[in-house]
């Protein structure tokens, strides 16, 4: 790294990297600490493709910033010149902008022109590997990203794992990204794993992410049969006793769940791979969502919204004004649900106008238009208009 420790109060002119040496360290700073600064300083980073050998691939750095310490705040502008490809690897937590954000750290990112391979041991995401409690990521500007490939235990299109963290997308910015996300434990189009434990309501507006069309896959290995894969969250945990998590969209934005079922995973969900909650007094509310499921969903439990609601999870899940279309071949080894693949002690509340379309549905154990299988004490309440006329089993 150029700096071992760097204060967020530092004023930096544009730093142009021609080509870093190949070693497992951060590009700019291993650690950024919070100094005497009221607002974030803008740091401009540019990667040019020219060196003596003519090489254009930046290899083996773990992130631009390795670790943002508690309370640190940075505004990072990253420009990769045409022809530059970045390979971020070697760290426990890997992300192009930052590997690890500690509590209450704040990072604003603008990203221009990018072809990325990002791999971490534990957590990896395009922007950040791991976000701790209260950390905030603001994506102020982002070019269309193509050929982005992410892999780790917990892999996410944006962030590998996060706890009580915030992601904000700038006015007029809609993220558009293609490539692949592959994980051995959790895989998410946005977050590999996300945990929420606060009492106040948390809302995720996923309309800003309708351009995220990453192919989601489980890596082979001993953990495959318990891996959770979802187009927004691989694993979503509500650990509060009374808290509402809302996932909302708009009528014009379609969430594409593009599953690569080469390796059988534990759970596939069109929005959430696996959901876990502490109490029925906490709610997961999904509303105004359009989901198109494509690819081969080779999983033990498949649901077009949630693959599995975890064992011993007393979960309350509401679904309202949602349209689901499962367009390509989908196979589930155990349970297949129009909304939820498998649920233990859950209350599924369906209201408004909900439509599920899927042809040639099959599973080894159970198939259901709403829930594939309840283990025990499960309840489904139907209100409004629920249309399952286009959901039918294989002959």
Q: Positions of the model-derived regions?
A:
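Surface-exposed loop/turn motifs in large extracellular/passenger domains
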Residues: 1-395
């Amino acid at each position: 790294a150029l700096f071992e420790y760097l204060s967020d109060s530092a004023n930096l002119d544009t730093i142009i990297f021609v080509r870093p040496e190949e070693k497992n360290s951060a590009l700019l700073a291993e650690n950024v600490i919070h100094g005497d600064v009221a607002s974030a300083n803008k740091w401009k980073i540019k990667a040019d493709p020219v060196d003596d050998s003519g090489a254009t691939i930046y290899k083996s750095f773990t992130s631009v910033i390795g670790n943002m310490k508690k309370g640190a705040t940075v505004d990072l502008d990253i420009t990769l010149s045409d022809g530059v490809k970045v390979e971020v690897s070697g760290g426990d937590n890997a992300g192009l902008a930052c590997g690890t954000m500690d509590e209450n750290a704040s990072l604003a990112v603008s990203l221009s022109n990018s072809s990325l391979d990002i791999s971490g041991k534990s957590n990896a995401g395009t922007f950040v590997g791991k976000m701790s409690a209260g950390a905030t990521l603001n994506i102020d500007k982002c070019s269309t990203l193509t050929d982005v490939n992410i892999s780790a235990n917990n892999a996410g299109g944006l962030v590998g794992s996060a706890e009580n963290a915030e992601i904000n997308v700038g006015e007029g910015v809609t993220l558009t990204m293609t490539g692949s996300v592959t994980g051995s434990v959790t895989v998410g189009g946005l977050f590999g794993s996300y945990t929420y434990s606060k009492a106040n309501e948390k809302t995720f507006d996923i309309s800003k992410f309708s351009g995220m069309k990453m192919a989601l896959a489980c890596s082979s290995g001993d953990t495959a049969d318990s891996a959770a894969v979802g187009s927004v969250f691989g694993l979503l945990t509500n650990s509060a006793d009374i808290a509402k998590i809302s996932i909302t969209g708009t009528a014009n934005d379609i969430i594409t769940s593009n599953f690569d079922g080469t390796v059988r995973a534990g759970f596939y969900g069109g929005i959430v791979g696996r959901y876990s909650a502490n109490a029925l007094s906490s709610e997961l509310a999904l509303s105004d969502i359009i989901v198109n499921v494509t690819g081969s969903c080779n999983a033990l439990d498949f649901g077009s919204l949630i693959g599995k609601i975890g064992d011993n999870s007393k979960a309350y899940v509401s679904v309202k004004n949602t349209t689901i279309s499962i367009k390509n071949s989908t196979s589930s080894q155990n349970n297949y649900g129009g909304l939820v693949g498998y649920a233990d002690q859950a209350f599924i509340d369906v209201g408004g106008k909900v439509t599920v379309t899927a042809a040639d549905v099959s599973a080894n154990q159970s198939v259901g238009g709403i829930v594939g299988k309840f283990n025990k004490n499960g309840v489904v309440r139907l209100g409004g208009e629920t249309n399952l006329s286009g959901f039918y089993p294989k002959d």
